[in-house]
UniProtKB/Swiss-Prot annotation:
Family recorded in the similarity comment: Belongs to the EPSP synthase family.
Catalytic activity, EC: 2.5.1.19
Catalytic activity: 3-phosphoshikimate + phosphoenolpyruvate = 5-O-(1-carboxyvinyl)-3-phosphoshikimate + phosphate
Listed name of the protein: 3-phosphoshikimate 1-carboxyvinyltransferase
Domain of life: Bacteria
Subunit structure: Monomer.
Tagged with keyword Acetylation: no
Subcellular location: Cytoplasm
Binding site for phosphoenolpyruvate: K20, G92, R120, Q167, R344, R388
Organism phylogeny: Bacteria, Bacillati, Bacillota, Bacilli, Bacillales
GO molecular function, one term: 3-phosphoshikimate 1-carboxyvinyltransferase activity
UniProt cross-references to Pfam families, sorted A to Z: EPSP_synthase (PF00275)
GO CC list: cytoplasm
Keywords, sorted A to Z: Amino-acid biosynthesis, Aromatic amino acid biosynthesis, Cytoplasm, Transferase
């Protein structure tokens, strides 16, 4: 795909698609609940459609019409042993959270995914689930897909996670809904808390004490209505575009502002971006608002520690942002980037260097020196099949002089099928 380059301005208003994390969880909890769940502003991206497909194979009646999904909950003991393998596609969230749910089911299931999923570590989830009593086998001792799982009666678990990962935490908590007793997860830093908020929305009970989250099982959930706010991880690409493309002003409507996810706003503010948030309100369990960003003069910052879990998915676009900030930006404590859809430390550095960025990889992040003009004399960049790399490169092309072609542009459909159309609407 040929990308727009040397863009003179980006102006307009868009509504980014529904939050991917919340869309996944809404389907999963709706499937476990008794009664009907209606999901509005659902993200119909490839990852979330994989979640729907898996739960249909587990016997759940799910109807989708665009961004509206109706789930007829199976209720306690209502999931059925699948006749076919459960294919999670490219979705790590589907894989890990589904394992937590399957751990509590008295039947056998096989879980597979695409080439990218086959490289992503599952041991961080299979290990604690085995401690709870699930029988899980797979490649390299159950650390990689394909995985075979036979669930059943689970023991409660008090688990200290070595990583701040919402997927690990959520898998254990979901399994804990089926265990007889209190299951808890303690994290080194606070990860996104959508699971905790949504279990409560579905009538469940969750206790949060500092960095420890616990559920007392077994629990019964009830169907509900949920509006999925705009995904701040998708909004991040346009927030950065608005800050670095000349003469720009972009407003993003109805964006989720969950404080465990707003690290990108903190970084933009620290860098000196002209950014404003209006119309803040609560939509069921999540804060939502409208964000406006304008072209800004930016300064370098250091990013690490507790901030990393709040912006881990935004680091590729933050790296681009840093190329346009005066000084040296350091991103550290971000080793989790190595086990995303790609090794994002490597892919970000490789692709931005093609465009002339002064960027280098470190063991747990990267260093970016700015402000650096980007150029593209017939350059070909590659998403590496990673949706966030593809969208970052499309924004990078906007400030590059010359011509840029993006390979594997279809990857963006994982989380933002209309991304290129929305970008064109701002030109």
């Amino acid at each position: 795909m040929q990308l727009p380059t040397n863009v003179s301005s980006l102006r307009g208003m868009i509504e980014v698609p529904g939050d991917k994390s919340i869309s996944h969880r809404a389907v999963m909890l709706g499937a476990l609940a008794s009664g009907r769940t209606v999901i509005d502003h659902f993200l119909p991206g490839a990852d979330c459609l994989s979640t729907i497909d898996c739960f249909r194979k587990l016997g759940v009646d799910i109807r989708q019409d665009g961004t509206t999904v109706v789930v007829e909950g199976a209720g306690p003991g209502g999931l059925r042993e699948p006749a076919a393998v459960l294919d999670v596609g490219n979705s790590g969230t589907t894989a890990r959270l589904l394992l937590g749910i399957l751990a509590g089911q008295p039947f056998h299931a096989c879980l597979v995914g695409d080439e990218s999923i086959a490289k992503r570590p599952m041991g961080r989830v299979t290990k604690p689930l085995r401690e709870m009593g699930a029988r899980i086998d797979g490649r390299e001792g159950g650390n990689y897909t394909p995985l075979s799982i036979r669930g059943g009666a689970l023991r409660p678990l008090r688990y200290t996670s070595p990583v701040a990962s919402a997927q690990v935490k959520s898998a254990i908590l979901l399994a804990g809904l089926f265990a007889d007793g209190v299951t808890s997860v303690a994290e080194p830093h606070r990860s996104r808390d959508h699971t905790e908020r949504m279990v409560r929305l579905f009538g469940g009970e969750v206790n949060v004490d500092g960095l420890t989250v616990s559920v007392a099982g077994p629990q019964r959930l009830r169907g509900t209505h949920i509006y999925v706010p705009g995904d701040i991880s998708s909004a991040a690409f346009f927030l950065v575009a608005g800050a670095i493309v000349p003469n720009s002003e972009i407003t993003l409507k109805n964006v989720g502002l969950n404080p465990t996810r707003t690290g990108i706003i903190d970084v933009l503010t620290q860098m000196g971006a002209d950014i404003a948030i209006d119309n803040v309100r609560n939509e069921e369990t999540e804060p939502v608002g409208d964000i406006t960003v304008r072209t800004s003069t930016l300064r370098a910052v250091e990013i690490g520690g507790d901030l990393i879990p709040r912006l881990i998915d935004e680091i590729p676009i933050i790296a681009l942002l840093a190329t346009q900030a005066e000084g040296t930006t350091v991103i550290k404590d971000a080793s989790e980037l190595k086990v995303k859809e790609t090794n994002r430390i490597h892919t970000v550095v490789t692709e931005l260097k093609k465009l002339g960025a002064d960027i280098e990889a470190t063991d747990d992040g990267m260093m970016i020196r700015g402000k650096t003009p980007l150029y593209a004399d017939g350059i070909v960049v590659d998403s590496h099949g990673d949706h966030r790399i593809g969208m970052m490169l499309a924004v990078a092309a906007c400030i590059a002089k010359g011509t840029v072609r993006l390979e594997r542009s279809e990857a963006v459909a994982v989380s933002y099928p209309a991304f290129f159309a929305d970008l064109r609407s701002l030109l």
